[in-house]
Amino acid sequence: MEIVWEVLFLLQANFIVCISAQQNSPKIHEGWWAYKEVVQGSFVPVPSFWGLVNSAWNLCSVGKRQSPVNIETSHMIFDPFLTPLRINTGGRKVSGTMYNTGRHVSLRLDKEHLVNISGGPMTYSHRLEEIRLHFGSEDSQGSEHLLNGQAFSGEVQLIHYNHELYTNVTEAAKSPNGLVVVSIFIKVSDSSNPFLNRMLNRDTITRITYKNDAYLLQGLNIEELYPETSSFITYDGSMTIPPCYETASWIIMNKPVYITRMQMHSLRLLSQNQPSQIFLSMSDNFRPVQPLNNRCIRTNINFSLQGKDCPNNRAQKLQYRVNEWLLK
């Protein structure tokens, strides 16, 4: 029997065109690092070494506001000043290129189709730059964030940059108030989220089997990716890949989205390498959770008990019951 929170938690396209990634793909997620050993006996820095092999990545080791984290629901704080998220697509569907980066499935939007987000913990409007998928080799793992110590089968991360202050995501990523990442947990089910179904159907996902493969998707509705909830959890953290800049506000939606078992199997068949190299599954592409270090985890879910956990003492402490939503 599946569990869902009573607090509610957590958190067709017209045509598809193939493109050449080798010629046109941006240099994304570059650098000498990995989530796991690439080949047994070889050394490519895994997460525990990221901050040791490159001085520019030292925050990966010494930072105190790192992501992901384990969300302990008993420690969450109600913040009455958190407003609902507002997604502005301009009433248009968008196009984007889906890449196999060797580490992630990454969907990057066409620059002619802008999607902005505001509200929630944000003072500024932020522009969607990338949608990134994390997933496990088995259903019991795959998400970067944990809920009461439990992982989910995957996690969708929508990475936005502050376009009011910065000209691009590279500048924003290393600057104050630079990034907002919306995170949505993935569970395996008999049905599929309509947006993820576009990304993960067989005709699409098999086009990006190997590293540097790319595929163009058109007629995408970003709002279809979001679960049917206005509730979320938020905290201040970092990028979860090197250089681990501590410039990200995280928003974790309070319901999961679903993909089918066949779609998850297709993800696990994606290779970290190019066709001429040994096959290594992209799965288990998640960073281990990092210490919370006294950071507040806030929510817009209203509960009645007063709490003193938050430094500004303006919030209320969460009181929750496990329902039939997420946990098992």
Swiss-Prot record:
Q: Which Pfam families does the UniProt record give?
A: Carb_anhydrase
| UniProt GO MF annotations | carbonate dehydratase activity; hydro-lyase activity; zinc ion binding
Residues passing through the membrane, by range: none
Q: What residues does the Alpha-carbonic anhydrase domain cover?
A: 31-301
Q: Which positions make up the signal peptide?
A: none
Concerning InterPro entries, the annotation shows:
Alpha_CARP_X/XI, CA_dom, CA_dom_sf, Carbonic_anhydrase_a-class
Q: In which tissues is it expressed?
A: Strong expression in brain and central nervous system.
The GO annotation for biological process reads:
brain development
PROSITE patterns this protein is in? ALPHA_CA_2
The task this protein performs is described as: Does not have a catalytic activity.
Which protein family is it in? Belongs to the alpha-carbonic anhydrase family.
Query: Can you say what this protein is called?
Result: Carbonic anhydrase-related protein 10
Please tell me the species this chain comes from: Homo sapiens (Human)
Q: Which gene encodes it?
A: CA10
